[in-house]
Amino acid sequence: MCVMDTRERALIRQSGLPEIILSAKYPVCVRTESGKFIDSNSVFLHLIKCQNSNSEIWFSGIDIDTQILFHTVEVD
């Protein structure tokens, strides 16, 4: 298998990610390495993050234990 095949397969696997996020019954979000929210589902917006909240302000406003928890459970 060549490198291109591996990349293409990875893209195909990832192509359904937005639908999975939106259909999840539990809170889900996707953030960049810098901490910026780039996607989330309505459950996350309702239970955890106010829709109109600035991501950086929101993240800095949660307690340090929760920030650490978010960092440890992030998926690369």
From Swiss-Prot:
It is found in: Cytoplasm. One of its GO terms (cellular component) is cytoplasm. GO terms for molecular function: DNA binding. Keywords: Activator, Conjugation, Cytoplasm, DNA-binding, Plasmid, Transcription, Transcription regulation. This protein is essential for positively regulating the expression of transfer genes that are involved in the conjugal transfer of DNA between bacterial cells. This is Protein TraJ. It comes from Escherichia coli.
